[in-house]
């Protein structure tokens, strides 16, 4: 079976420059790579053709021979003896560029790992959350060794270049037709080895410590808010950047107030005479007591809004409100005189369901009467 033309395989003209050939190869190799087409024999065969064409057309000597003699230039007895395209080509460059991010290859020394991020759960009272507070916290962490300054090597020595990968952090492994780069098993990709480890950190470059931090909590935070302290996480390996510390806010339940966004809610009990006749009562706010005027004929559950007495948003903007929900209390512990007065009051209303003085009761009982009338029809 005749072999396909190398230029046709890559989809380029016979006058294509090397950069065009390389670009075409990258595109096709990405499409037909075996790792992206597992179990697809046709894709695997196509990938081999693409690699063969790329190797020939990016080698000036081989390309010239191919242009003059075609595939015959590489058959037994042709150019270079031995034929084929198995000798000498190093695909580490193209593989690093094309497949590094996708298949974990890539070139060069593995970067030292950034330090891990840490999390701290901080409980605040409502007052602390609303006004802001500065608190000291203690957190266990890994810090850079102060003896070797993160290198892991004993004082007076330094890490040595890995003899296996010669400092590259990777080694090339040939698996049949393919040449694959892998992390160096000797140095784990660092490119260096520590022959004389530091006596304090034993070569790790980091030591366990508990550090104390002063954390400023801004006014207006709420449960679920998270504060990031850059660089206050664990130290990175061998001089790599430190991680971050995230302070997670949890606001404790308050005895009086409930928070909803930037608004505060509280229940204000009033007796039935104030509800009926109106009056004035002191209610609590986070800034102290204020006076609330209750109009006559106030029903239980009515909300009174006190503007600007809520929480100032941590992100700026208008301050929230305080909403007072009145609860009309039924009197208890009545003496005989009080009971008699209430009976007289009830009679003046025209009975327990006085129509003129209890509109909701009238509406309710009218509805009940209609319901039963409809049932008996």
Curated annotation (Swiss-Prot):
Gene Ontology MF annotations: ATP binding; heat shock protein binding; unfolded protein binding; zinc ion binding
CXXCXGXG motif repeats: 145-152, 162-169, 184-191, 198-205
Pfam name, any one: DnaJ_CXXCXGXG
Domain named J: residues: 5-70
BP-aspect Gene Ontology terms: chaperone cofactor-dependent protein refolding; DNA replication; protein refolding; response to heat
Residue numbers binding Zn(2+) 2: 162, 165, 184, 187
Record-level GO cellular component terms: cytoplasm
Cofactor binding remark: Binds 2 Zn(2+) ions per monomer.
Zinc finger (CR-type) stretch: 132-210
Presence of the UniProt keyword Zinc-finger in the record: yes
Cofactor: Zn(2+)
Keyword vocabulary terms for this entry: Chaperone, Cytoplasm, DNA replication, Metal-binding, Repeat, Stress response, Zinc, Zinc-finger
KW Zinc-finger (keyword) present: yes
Locations listed in the record: Cytoplasm
Family: Belongs to the DnaJ family.
SUBUNIT field: Homodimer.
Task of the protein: Participates actively in the response to hyperosmotic and heat shock by preventing the aggregation of stress-denatured proteins and by disaggregating proteins, also in an autonomous, DnaK-independent fashion. Unfolded proteins bind initially to DnaJ; upon interaction with the DnaJ-bound protein, DnaK hydrolyzes its bound ATP, resulting in the formation of a stable complex. GrpE releases ADP from DnaK; ATP binding to DnaK triggers the release of the substrate protein, thus completing the reaction cycle.
Record NCBIfam families: DnaJ_bact (TIGR02349), PRK10767.1 (NF008035)
UniProt domain comment: The J domain is necessary and sufficient to stimulate DnaK ATPase activity. Zinc center 1 plays an important role in the autonomous, DnaK-independent chaperone activity of DnaJ. Zinc center 2 is essential for interaction with DnaK and for DnaJ activity.
Entry protein name: Chaperone protein DnaJ
Organism annotation: Klebsiella pneumoniae (strain 342)
């Amino acid at each position: 079976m005749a072999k396909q033309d190398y230029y046709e395989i890559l989809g380029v003209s016979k006058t294509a420059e090397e950069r065009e050939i390389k670009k075409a190869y990258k595109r096709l190799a990405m499409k037909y790579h075996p790792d992206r087409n597992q179990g697809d024999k046709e894709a695997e065969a196509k990938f081999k053709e693409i690699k063969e064409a790329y190797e020939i057309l990016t080698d000036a000597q081989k390309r010239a021979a191919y242009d003059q003699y075609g595939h015959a230039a590489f058959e037994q007895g042709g150019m270079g003896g031995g034929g084929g395209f198995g000798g000498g080509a190093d695909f580490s460059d193209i593989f690093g560029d094309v497949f590094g991010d996708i298949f974990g290859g890539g070139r060069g020394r593995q970067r030292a790992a950034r330090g891990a991020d840490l999390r701290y759960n901080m409980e605040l009272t409502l007052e602390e959350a609303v006004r802001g507070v500065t608190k000291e916290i203690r957190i266990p962490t890994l810090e850079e060794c102060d003896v070797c300054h993160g290198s892991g090597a004993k004082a007076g020595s330094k890490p040595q270049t890995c003899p296996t990968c010669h400092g590259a952090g990777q080694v090339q492994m040939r698996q049949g037709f393919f040449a694959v780069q892998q992390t160096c098993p000797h140095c784990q990709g660092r490119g260096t080895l520590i022959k004389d480890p530091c006596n304090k950190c034993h070569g790790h470059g980091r030591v366990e410590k508990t550090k104390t931090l002063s954390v400023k909590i801004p006014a207006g935070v709420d449960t679920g808010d998270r504060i990031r302290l850059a660089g206050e996480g664990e130290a990175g390996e061998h001089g790599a950047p430190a991680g971050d510390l995230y302070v997670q806010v949890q606001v404790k339940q308050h005895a009086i107030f409930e928070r909803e966004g930037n608004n505060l809610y509280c229940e204000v009990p009033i007796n039935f005479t104030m509800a009926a006749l109106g009056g004035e009562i002191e209610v609590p706010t986070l800034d102290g007591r204020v006076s609330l005027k209750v109009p006559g004929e106030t029903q239980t559950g009515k909300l009174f809004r006190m503007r600007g007495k809520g929480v100032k948003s941590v992100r700026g903007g208008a301050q929230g409100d305080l909403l007072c929900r009145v609860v009309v209390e039924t009197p208890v512990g009545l003496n005989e005189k009080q009971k008699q007065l209430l009976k007289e009051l009830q009679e003046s209303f025209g009975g327990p369901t006085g129509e003129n003085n209890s509109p909701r009761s009238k509406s309710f009982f009218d509805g009940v009467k209609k319901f039963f009338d409809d049932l008996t029809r």
